[in-house]
Amino acid sequence: MSWLEKLLDKKNIINTRKASIPEGVWTKCPSCDQVLYRIALKENLEVCPKCQHHLRMSARHRLDGFLDKGERIELASEYEPKDLLNFKDKKRYKERLALSQKSTGEKDALVVMKGELLGLPIVACAFEFSFMAGSMGSVVGARFVDAVDTAIEENCGLVCFSACGGARMQESLMALMQMAKTSAALERLSNARLPYISVLTDQTFGGVSASLAMLGDINIGEPEARIGFAGRRVIEQTVREKLPDGFQQSEFLLEHGALDMIVQRHDMRERIGGLIAKLTNTSIRLEVK
């Protein structure tokens, strides 16, 4: 055997394998392109430490970071969506529901919990945007109404974090009816003289922005959140005009009176707790930072 054959002999070849990185360990900030460690980003409430861009949060992660640690009770979790119209577009509605339920672990796009905020009893709900773009169907409407009714029964404030693409087209008129249903429920909350704080996050559009998201006693936006009814492209095609840059961002809406304030995610607990305390004439438990 020649020296070359010996060199190429399989026994003399050392196999090297590239180290594989598990999927989901790293992510990239969509604003500054900074590569971020996923666990550290989650601990920082999905806020980029470099540019302070607010990334999307899951509903449960948001409520977990917002409510006090301790006992929390999930409300209306027994409601499950049904395909009453046997709707089909590129996929059957049942298939879309099954895929969203599997990927998110949620039954539908709204999570409601009862707990405390800085020692104050509160009902809080959050949209899960990853579930069919957070679209509002009959289950979302029913859960929101239950949240309102519980707040009235418990004589406490209600907070809602919106992240939604609009009414769920697969449920047709039943989805559109939720706009009136949720608005009527909020009228009962107002008559009970209980506060409703609406937090609009990126992105909040369609039937939710035209109903429950904009009906807060105080409407709060997260920084650079996109908020509107129709999308920019649809509006420009309709009015045949070029629209100003950032006209659907929270900063533009604050400047033009559509929002009351913009609050950083890390300040949300203290700011909302203080607002509810003032509106209900109660005191809060101050946190030591």
UniProtKB/Swiss-Prot annotation:
GO molecular function: acetyl-CoA carboxylase activity; ATP binding; carboxyl- or carbamoyltransferase activity; zinc ion binding
Pfam short name (any one): Carboxyl_trans
GO cellular component: acetate CoA-transferase complex
Species of provenance: Vibrio parahaemolyticus serotype O3:K6 (strain RIMD 2210633)
InterPro entries recorded: AcCoA_carboxyl_beta, Acetyl_CoA_COase_Trfase_b_su, ClpP/crotonase-like_dom_sf, COA_CT_N, Znf-ACC
Zn finger region (C4-type): 29-51
Binding site residues for Zn(2+): C29, C32, C48, C51
Domain (CoA carboxyltransferase N-terminal) ranges: 25-289
HAMAP family, per database record: AcetylCoA_CT_beta
Function: Component of the acetyl coenzyme A carboxylase (ACC) complex. Biotin carboxylase (BC) catalyzes the carboxylation of biotin on its carrier protein (BCCP) and then the CO(2) group is transferred by the transcarboxylase to acetyl-CoA to form malonyl-CoA.
Disulfide bond among keywords: no
PANTHER family registered for this protein in UniProt: ACETYL-COENZYME A CARBOXYLASE CARBOXYL TRANSFERASE SUBUNIT BETA, CHLOROPLASTIC (PTHR42995:SF5)
E.C. numbers: 2.1.3.15
Protein name, UniProt field: Acetyl-coenzyme A carboxylase carboxyl transferase subunit beta 2
Biological classification of the source: Bacteria, Pseudomonadati, Pseudomonadota, Gammaproteobacteria, Vibrionales
Cofactor note (record): Binds 1 zinc ion per subunit.
Name of the top EC class for this enzyme: transferase
Entry cofactors: Zn(2+)
Catalytic function, reaction form: N(6)-carboxybiotinyl-L-lysyl-[protein] + acetyl-CoA = N(6)-biotinyl-L-lysyl-[protein] + malonyl-CoA
Pathway: Lipid metabolism; malonyl-CoA biosynthesis; malonyl-CoA from acetyl-CoA: step 1/1
